[in-house]
Amino acid sequence: AKQEIMFYATQAREAYPYYQHERIGYNYRMSNICAGIGRGQMTVADAHVAHHKHTCDLYRELLKDVKGITLHENPSGRFDSNYWLNTIVLDPLLRVKGQENAYQATVQGAVGGAGGVTHVAVNAHTDCEPNANVEAMRMGLDAMGIESRPLWKPMHKQPVYKNCPAYVNGVSESLFKVGLCLPSGPYVTDRDIEYIVGGIRGLIER
């Protein structure tokens, strides 16, 4: 019973390398203490944003000559992203080592450092999932101790919402298939980023 309660209180995620919801869950975990800590964090918000922007700049510099990988950018000078999360997209034709083994087994537990309780997946595949090269990149980075994760699965493709109306144009599905989130937190160092990009480069088949 406790596990089931925690399952619903920690987003009700199934055991896939991306967010897969077959039941509606919640995120009921903030206490007054956590709220107080959040207020305290506002005093370092500017420093964190500056760090995130620096992190993106370094990813951009180190990935600029890697064919088949694109780092997200501001669409124009009218935008000023805080880059709280850095994401890349992989060209579907990019070959990644081990992609023939992607989705050969179900995931055990949460992925990418996420907490909470997950249900055991019945099948490694769903009707909407990242491309094999994206999953291979995630798995390869994980083997190096690097946490990464696919982009968020579109809400209208979550089983729990399958009977709900949706107005779509295909963009969210196409991005989900090719996108990968990279470590971007305030404690990610320049050396960490160099290691991460080295891992990405090493996983690409030449």
Where are these regions (language model features)?
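PLP-dependent aminotransferase class I/II
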Residues: K2-R206
